[in-house]
């Protein structure tokens, strides 16, 4: 891995850890701060809201900054946010600190994707983005379990102190490894926002929302599925989630290679396979070994779509990629929240856990339909705004 990509991956590891580790610490946080579990759960929603709101704001604020300075500033915000999480005296301050921390998330991955794609040869750009996002998948495999164990042993604040340390290590890696002469975007606020007039950019954002909703409509409720339907113990569920995380890691690498080979066909095939695997999961969740195989393959497919979607947004907004790339991170998080809400609504309306994967299938089919429409438009000439000519 080239050193600049390694530095970006270290930062991605820290950001991914702080995003997801709170899920394993909710009982500890609720007990320590004297709030209910649902109230503590809002710390997850607050983070997602921070990503969605902060991504476009910071993309515009940093549009004229040198890329290295922008990334260093964003990781500095990440460090400060986690520091305030660690010392938060109460729930309100912790929520505010979570939102501030989330502000850097979308902008960092958005700008980082553009930087990563410019560090390598044109035929390896998707793989470069996948390498950066490897940090995010490793956060699920290693960062979240270790952070949860640390928080359970020494208190949830210890986890945020540790993540602050990861942020400092990431800042040092970025300072040393990122070149100073990174390409500066020749852009303006008007040009950045003009990408929203491009139908293909909007389609990619829509695909990202639907694909992410397909995952989280089921994965949000994976623990009760595995315990109540499959029959795994809570301890065994931890190992199943580790297996899913390994699948995510494999999927990110595979998705990068496929996107550099045949981007649109590989995306279409992956979305179709996601729908098929989720449909199969409705049956295999009753059988422990079959469920394990299905979950691992699902993990591979779930993250294999990220590199092609990220490089597509960069290409389709080639004159002003920073805002579009950053908005795509917001789209993924909007899909996370939408999927969790749809799954919860389905369960609340009487849909059983066994039937829940069909909600994910519906979202995957919708994402596939939008992708096929995008592909059909891509094959024929279309009128585009003058900014792209």
Predicted segment positions?
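Intracellular juxtamembrane helix-capping segments at the cytosolic ends
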Residues: 108-120, 304-317
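C-terminal transmembrane helical hairpin of 12-TM major facilitator-type secondary transporters
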Residues: 265-309
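Helix-to-loop junctions at the C-terminal end of transmembrane segments
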Residues: 55-66, 251-263, 347-348
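Conserved MFS/SLC helix-loop-helix module at the cytosolic interface between two early adjacent transmembrane helices
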Residues: 53-92
């Amino acid at each position: 891995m080239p050193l600049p990509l390694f530095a970006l991956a270290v930062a991605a590891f820290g950001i991914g850890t702080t995003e997801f580790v709170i899920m394993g610490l909710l009982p500890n946080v609720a007990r320590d701060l004297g709030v209910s579990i649902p109230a503590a759960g809002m710390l997850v929603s607050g983070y997602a809201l921070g990503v969605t709101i902060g991504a476009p704001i910071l993309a515009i604020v940093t549009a004229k900054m040198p890329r290295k300075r922008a990334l260093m500033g964003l990781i500095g915000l990440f460090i400060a946010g986690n520091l305030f999480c660690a010392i938060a005296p109460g729930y309100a301050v912790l929520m505010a600190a979570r939102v501030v921390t989330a502000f850097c998330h979308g902008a960092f991955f958005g700008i980082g994707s553009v930087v990563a794609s410019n560090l390598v040869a044109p035929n390896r750009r998707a793989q470069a983005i996948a390498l950066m996002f490897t940090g995010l998948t490793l956060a699920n495999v290693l960062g979240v379990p270790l952070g949860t164990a640390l928080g359970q042993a020494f208190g949830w604040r210890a986890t945020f102190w540790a993540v602050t340390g990861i942020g400092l290590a990431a800042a040092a890696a970025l300072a040393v490894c990122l070149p100073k002469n990174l390409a500066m975007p020749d852009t303006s606020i008007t040009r950045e926002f003009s990408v929203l007039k491009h139908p293909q950019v909007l389609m990619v954002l829509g695909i990202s929302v639907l694909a992410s909703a397909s995952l989280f409509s089921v994965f949000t409720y994976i623990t009760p599925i595995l315990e109540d339907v499959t029959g795994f113990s809570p301890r065994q569920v931890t190992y199943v989630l580790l297996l899913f995380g390994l699948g995510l890691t494999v999927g990110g690498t595979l998705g990068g290679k496929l996107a550099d080979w045949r981007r649109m066909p590989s995306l279409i095939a992956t979305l179709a396979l996601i729908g098929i695997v989720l449909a199969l999961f409705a049956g295999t969740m009753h059988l422990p070994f079959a469920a394990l195989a299905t979950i691992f393959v699902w993990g591979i497919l779930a993250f294999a779509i990220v590199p092609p979607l990220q490089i597509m947004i960069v290409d389709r907004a080639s004159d002003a990629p920073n805002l579009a790339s950053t908005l795509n991170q917001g789209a993924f998080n909007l899909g996370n929240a939408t999927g969790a809400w749809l799954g919860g609504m389905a369960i609340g309306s009487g849909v059983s856990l066994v039937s829940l994967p069909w909600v994910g299938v519906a979202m995957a089919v919708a994402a596939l339909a939008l992708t096929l429409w995008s592909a059909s438009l891509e094959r024929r000439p279309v009128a585009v705004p003058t900014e792209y000519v």
